[in-house]
Design a protein with these regions (language model features):
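Conserved SAM-binding loop of SAM-dependent methyltransferases across substrates and taxa
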Residues: 53-65
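S-adenosyl-L-methionine-dependent methyltransferase catalytic module, highlighting the catalytic core
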Residues: 120-125, 129, 142-244
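N-terminal, positively charged/glycine-rich alpha-helical extensions of SAM-dependent methyltransferases
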Residues: 1-19
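A conserved beta-strand element that flanks and buttresses the S-adenosyl-L-methionine
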Residues: 133
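S-adenosyl-L-methionine
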Residues: 88-124
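Conserved SAM-binding motif I beta-strand of class I
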Residues: 67-73
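Conserved alpha-helix/loop element of class I SAM-dependent methyltransferases that forms part
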Residues: 22-44
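Conserved class I S-adenosyl-L-methionine
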Residues: 44-52
């Protein structure tokens, strides 16, 4: 079986990962440069929360990280009404199957690259980290501020966050341009069922200013925030934040 055939044998890919010249058929990240991750992570111990197929885990290792610990609790359900996979196909996958496949082909050792099925609320079991990645996961947390508190407690240097934001879009108006960001509002929109993206694991989306104040409340300083872009579609309504300890 060729490498491409092996890649295609998996029922679902979330990330686009280059392994040996073949790129896995996911869709994320939409633009990796927008995350503003340091080019040099030499010697850093990194935590990747919500790792999925492992794009950011392997990217940190490429940039010199001495060890990356990836966690996911697999609570997200990409077979929501607007997703590109059925529930039947999603349930065919095995936890960490695509991650382990990529890790093997990229040649990383167990010491360099560890992964655990774990809630973000339990990260203290893993020790301290220089850098934390928290991408595409905040809005899946029922208790988002608690999640940031937990991550702050294990972060020695920097955290990078990417999340859905409601500055330019409300799931209740369903129109781009009708959000909460124009007045710098510090608000968070709550989704009790599947209002955002028809996905029942999407609980919240903050405004950019709310994201900033949440990081500050969790103990981070020198916080920077930036949008993914001026959105034209809902998938582009994303925001980033960086905080230091």
């Amino acid at each position: 079986m060729t490498l491409k055939e092996k890649i295609d044998s998996f029922p679902f890919w979330y990330h686009k990962i280059d392994i040996g010249g073949e790129v896995t058929p996911g869709w994320a990240p939409l633009n990796a440069d927008n995350y503003n991750i340091p080019d040099d992570l030499t010697g850093k111990r990194v935590l990747d929360v919500g790792a999925w197929d492992g794009y950011w885990t392997f990217e940190a290792l490429k940039r010199g990280a001495s060890q990356v610990v990836a966690i996911d609790d697999w609570s997200d359900m990409p077979y929501a009404k607007d997703a590109m996979i059925t529930k039947k196909d999603y349930e065919k996958r095995t936890e960490w199957d695509t991650f382990d496949f990529c890790k093997s082909h990229l040649g990383y050792t167990d010491d360099q690259c560890q992964r655990y099925t774990m809630s973000v609320y339990d990260v203290e079991k893993l020790g301290m980290f220089d850098v934390v990645f928290f991408f595409g996961a905040l809005y899946h947390c029922r208790y988002p501020l608690l999640a940031l508190d937990k991550l702050s407690a294990v972060c020695k240097e920097e955290i990078y966050v990417e999340t859905a934001v409601c500055d330019d879009y409300s799931a209740y108006t369903k129109t781009i341009g009708f959000g909460y960001g124009n007045m710098g509002n510090v608000v968070m929109e709550f989704y009790p069922t599947d209002e955002l993206g028809y996905c029942p694991t999407n609980w919240w989306s903050p405004t950019m200013q709310c994201l900033r104040t949440m990081l500050a409340s969790a103990g981070f300083n020198e916080i920077e925030i930036w949008k993914f872009m001026e959105p034209k579609v809902v998938a582009q309504c994303r925001g980033f934040a960086k905080g230091k300890k």
